[in-house]
């Protein structure tokens, strides 16, 4: 994976929130996802773009 695509700008993380819980997100570098612990969802990052759709998120209990 391209190194630039595997990083998330910390300023972006400060602005983005989970669309379901409105809670903070953390970056999971191993899975390249933004994680909402509150909603127990992980949003994928594809081609450097966070996909902030609940329908595209992975449940953390899976």
UniProtKB/Swiss-Prot annotation:
Gene3D superfamilies: 2.20.25.10. It comes from the Bacteria. SUPFAM superfamilies: Trm112p-like. GO terms for cellular component: cytosol. InterPro entries: Trm112-like. PANTHER family: PROTEIN PREY, MITOCHONDRIAL, ZGC:162634. HAMAP family: UPF0434. Belongs to the UPF0434 family. This is UPF0434 protein RHECIAT_CH0004260. It comes from Rhizobium etli (strain CIAT 652).
């Amino acid at each position: 994976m391209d190194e630039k695509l595997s990083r998330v700008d910390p300023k972006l993380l400060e602005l983005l929130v989970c669309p379901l819980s409105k809670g903070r997100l953390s970056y999971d570098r191993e899975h390249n996802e933004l994680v909402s612990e509150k909603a127990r969802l992980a949003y994928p990052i594809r081609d450097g773009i966070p996909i902030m759709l609940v329908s595209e998120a992975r449940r953390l209990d899976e």
